[in-house]
Amino acid sequence: MNKLTERVLCVGVSGLILFSVAALVQGTKKCYANPVRNRAASRVKPYADSFKEFTNIDEARAWGDKQFAKYKLSSSEKNALTIYTRNAARINGPLRANQGNTNGLPADIRKEVEQIDKSFTKMQTPENIILFRGDDPGYLGPDFENTILNRDGTINKAVFEQVKLRFKGKDRKEYGYISTSLVNGSAFAGRPIITKFKVLDGSKAGYIEPISTFKGQLEVLLPRSSTYTISDMQIAPNNKQIIITALLKR
């Protein structure tokens, strides 16, 4: 029953995926030949380039819990990660302001950063995987944050074309840590920018849901000072979100 067979798999490549328990909405579909489990009813989608995307909460959580058990984090590392999830801006703000330089940071924040950095020596992805993040218009910077949305909340297409010219095909560096999720869930429904991170096998990334302050986010944390390449930018079918595809550099 679990043997792999070659058949055509249709996957959503530009649409928004939202869930409310079992609800699922997908956008435009495109078909690729891919090995998938015969009749296995798996809701993990292999893409043509072999990146895995979860669309089912329970399957995503089971996968994440399995990874977390492998990390063997110390109590100090767990505590620092929990503190981060409680108020990420408290740590990321100073890191961004200092372009990743920890010199001059308050002693307590510097200590937490050291422990979080240490945890990444134990946390990595066992396979290529898709992670999601939702952002507000401020992600696009002062040139676009106040003009990218029309009054009705839809994307201003003329401004979007300028955004693509500015960002598509370019690298972006984040001096703070990057909080992502295993699923594109309802928590992102109100965010106008959704980034789909392609994360390569062996990349530093940690599933920290079991020790997160706010449960249910299925959070995967990426290291500070990560760089990623924005390979594609599309407007979602509902015309209210920009879907960014980005490859995380190792």
From Swiss-Prot:
Cite the TR mART core domain residue spans from the record: 49-250
This entry carries the following GO cellular component terms, namely: extracellular region
Q: Does the keyword Glycosyltransferase apply?
A: yes
EC code: 2.4.2.-
Q: What catalytic reaction does the record list?
A: L-asparaginyl-[protein] + NAD(+) = N(4)-(ADP-D-ribosyl)-L-asparaginyl-[protein] + nicotinamide + H(+)
Q: What is its main location?
A: secreted
* Molecular function via GO: NAD+-protein mono-ADP-ribosyltransferase activity; nucleotidyltransferase activity
* Name of the featured protein: Mono-ADP-ribosyltransferase C3
